[in-house]
Amino acid sequence: MPPSLTREEVVPSRKRIKLPPWLEVAKPRLIPLLLATTLGGMALTEGWPLSSPRLVCTLGGGALAAAAAGVLNCLWEQELDGRMLRTSGRALPSGRLSPSAAFVGAVSCTLAAAALLVSGVNCLAAGLSLLGLCSYVLLYTALLKPRTTQNIVVGGVAGAIPPLVGAAAATGHIGLGGWWLFALVMVWTPAHFWALALLLHDDYRAVGIPMLPVVKGPLVTTRAIRRYGWATILLSFLGIWALPEGGALYGLLILPFNGRLLQMVERLAAEPNNRDRAKGLFRWSILYLFGVCLLLVMSRMSGAAQFDLQVRAVVDILSGGFLTVAS
């Protein structure tokens, strides 16, 4: 496979926006997708829509917890980042931000997140947010990432917790809808991340991180991506039943998203060494998850409920006609 792309070539927005060091270590570009899945978790409950104060506290607390996790991840990996050309210019390894300042920022964000979620939402949402933080830093970054090719499969639990936070914020408990979106994000994560790992495999190899493309090569990796891509598509259709209402609209609108994801997964599987295919899948997978969450929210609007009733009426008429003919 040709040499790895730089992260800037994969995510070109980094060339256009120079963040201050204290914000850079919080990894703010990852936060919007986490908040989108939080909203998706809310939309899957009977508690939707939330009051404005509760919504703001949930998203604000989630953003602070995610920022704290990003800072702690950077602190843990600063020596590793300093050994890679791609990451050596980051705030901590380059010396633009001191570790002590970063640690104080991480603790402050954690405490602020906990206070906001406990006071403005509920203890379950606060506890789940802190669980997500700990699982990202301890389970994924410290334990799994340097030890196994399946690091992102198990470690992906950290990124899948926000839907549970959203469901807990809306109702005070986690219903089946929240668990469905948790599972969807879990199976979405490997295909998304391994597409990026294909592009950055030389960096991971240089520092001894056993990502799947490094250990098994592109052929095995793209086959695994294909399996998880198919699992994501199949699982996504369960959202039709996971939604309290509006499932028919969601089921209709998810079709083009799944069609495009399937196309990109199959193209990469057919050309394991094609860097453009891997880059395209990585980028589309982000838009895909944003799209799923947007559809979940749209499906809870009043017009979607009407569409649901109309579809059910048509199905009842068709099924009644079929039974009449059959008899």
Swiss-Prot record:
One of its GO terms (cellular component) is plasma membrane. It is a multi-pass membrane protein. Keywords: Cell inner membrane, Cell membrane, Heme biosynthesis, Membrane, Transferase, Transmembrane, Transmembrane helix. The chain crosses the membrane at residues 55-75, 101-121, 124-144, 152-172, 180-200, 237-257, 278-298. It catalyses: heme b + (2E,6E)-farnesyl diphosphate + H2O = Fe(II)-heme o + diphosphate. One of its GO terms (biological process) is heme O biosynthetic process. The keyword Signal does not apply. It is found in: Cell inner membrane. Belongs to the UbiA prenyltransferase family. Protoheme IX farnesyltransferase subfamily. Converts heme B (protoheme IX) to heme O by substitution of the vinyl group on carbon 2 of heme B porphyrin ring with a hydroxyethyl farnesyl side group. Carbon 2 of the heme B porphyrin ring is defined according to the Fischer nomenclature. This is Protoheme IX farnesyltransferase. It comes from Synechococcus sp. (strain CC9311).
